[in-house]
Each structure stands twice: as C-alpha cells, then as structure tokens.
C-alpha cells in the first residue's frame, strides 16, 4: 500500500516536471495580429457555401 502511494506521488511529480519543462507561454489575447500574415483565398465552393 505504501509503495502504491509512493508510486502515485512519483508519477505526479514526473508529469508536472515534464509539463513544466515543455510549457510554452500562450500568446496574449491582446497581442497585435501579425501584419505579415496573409488570409487564405476562398475557393469558389467556399464562396458558394457562404452565399447560401
């Protein structure tokens, strides 16, 4: 029983450590949009579906 609890604690620490090492900061929702990004052109089928 004691070894099972220890195993769970070790697993939690390993998972949290893995996530902490690989965590990337999320982009701010208030960040400016990329001025160099280009919108993908819509295909005629997509235009027709938008038109209804």
UniProtKB/Swiss-Prot annotation:
The keyword Secreted applies. Its main location: secreted. Residues 24-41 form a propeptide. Residues 30-52 are annotated as: Disordered. Residues 1-23 form the signal peptide. Residues 37-52 have a biased composition (Low complexity). One of its GO terms (molecular function) is toxin activity. Not found in venom, suggesting that it is a minor component. Negative results: Has no activity against fungi (B.cinerea and C.albicans) and bacteria (E.coli and S.aureus). Has no hemolytic activity against human erythrocytes. Does not show cytolytic activity against insect cell lines. Does not induce feeding disorder in lepidopteran larvae after peptide injection in the vicinity of the head and thorax. This is Venom peptide 4b. It comes from Eumenes pomiformis.
């Amino acid at each position: 029983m004691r070894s099972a609890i220890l195993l769970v604690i070790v697993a939690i620490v390993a998972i949290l450590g893995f996530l902490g090492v690989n965590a990337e900061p999320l982009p701010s929702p208030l960040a400016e949009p990329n001025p160099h990004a280009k919108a993908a052109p819509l295909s005629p089928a997509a235009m027709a579906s938008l038109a209804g």
